[in-house]
Amino acid sequence: MQTSRLNLVRLTEDHLPGYHAIWSDPFTTRWSPHGHCATLDDSREWMSGLLPDVNPKGVNYAVLLRADLDPGVIQARHGSGSPGGDGDGDAVLQPGGFLGYVGTWKSEPEPEVGLIFHRSTWGLGFATEALNAFLELFWKERPEFEHLVAWVDEENAASSNVFRKCGFHLVETCKGDYTLKWMVPELRNSLHFRARRPDGTTAT
């Protein structure tokens, strides 16, 4: 599926280099209980849980910059430097570049959507654009589901804003429900978001 700037394609092993570029960064992955991936093999193993052979019910997409997008569109708006200050930003923000991932990493007991983007893309609106496109795809591909959920650390304002912009509503705040050993405090609070199918109906 294409948007004005993005191309969402099914995540495959071919996307491992871009996936590893994101998951090898401790700062980008600091909100994940999994933590960063130290080696390419670590990223390969972590990504395998999103692929159809292991996760047949998952709906998981690589988010790429459209190959036909003029690089000047990005450069003119944000300058030649990387917005996130990462040295790999120039390589990522090129036509066809792997920007991030969005998908349902698990479906039981209910489908849960997650997303993560290379830090050079932060602040450019790609996450919101990708999640909106993903929702359109998900509701078509999984008519049996009435809703999607997402869990976000209470201090992760950027991700919370993305989910809210895309129609997710806060259900509850769960106090001290998980741990991030590299954060202060280690015991974390999480926000439980939910989005309903737009037409409010499910398959019969």
Residue ranges and their predicted role:
Residues 1-29, 60-204:
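Acyl-donor (CoA/ACP) binding surface of acyl/acetyltransferases
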Residues 20, 34-35, 55:
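Short, surface-exposed helix-loop/turn micro-motifs enriched in polar/charged residues
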Residues 27-49:
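Conserved GNAT-fold acetyl-CoA-binding loop/helix
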Residues 38, 48-62, 70:
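A short helix-loop-beta-strand connector motif used in the catalytic cores of GNAT acetyltransferases and
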Residues 47-51, 178-181:
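Short, P/G- and charge-enriched loop/turn segments at secondary-structure junctions
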